[in-house]
C-alpha cells in the first residue's frame, strides 16, 4: 500500500517566491529525489504534488502460504513453517 503527504514550501529570503520540497521524518528532500526507508520498509519519491511512499518487501502487500507464516527480515519477506525457524521455501 502507499501513503501520500502534500508538498512543503519555504519562502526565499532574498528572492521572490518559494522553494518546494518534501519532508519525511524531519528530513527535507528535493523534488525528483527518491529513497528507501528501511525502518518502515517503504520506497519514497518526492514529486511536485508531494511525497509518495509505498511498501516494499514485507510491507508490499499481504498474502498467505498454507502452513507457513510471513516474517519481516530487514524488509525482506520470509516464510517460515508455523511455530518453527525453518524456511518454507529455499531458493
From Swiss-Prot:
One of its GO terms (molecular function) is pheromone activity. GO terms for cellular component: extracellular region. It is found in: Secreted. Expressed in ciliated epithelium of nidamental gland and in secretory-like cells in accessory nidamental gland (at protein level). Expressed in ovary, nidamental gland and accessory nidamental gland. Keywords: Behavior, Disulfide bond, Pheromone, Secreted. Disulfide bonds join 2-54, 22-46, 41-75, 44-53, 68-88. The keyword Thylakoid does not apply. Belongs to the beta-microseminoprotein family. Acts as a pheromone. Triggers aggressive behaviors in males such as fin beating, lunging and grabbing. These behaviors form part of the competition for fertile females. This is Beta-microseminoprotein. It comes from Doryteuthis pealeii.
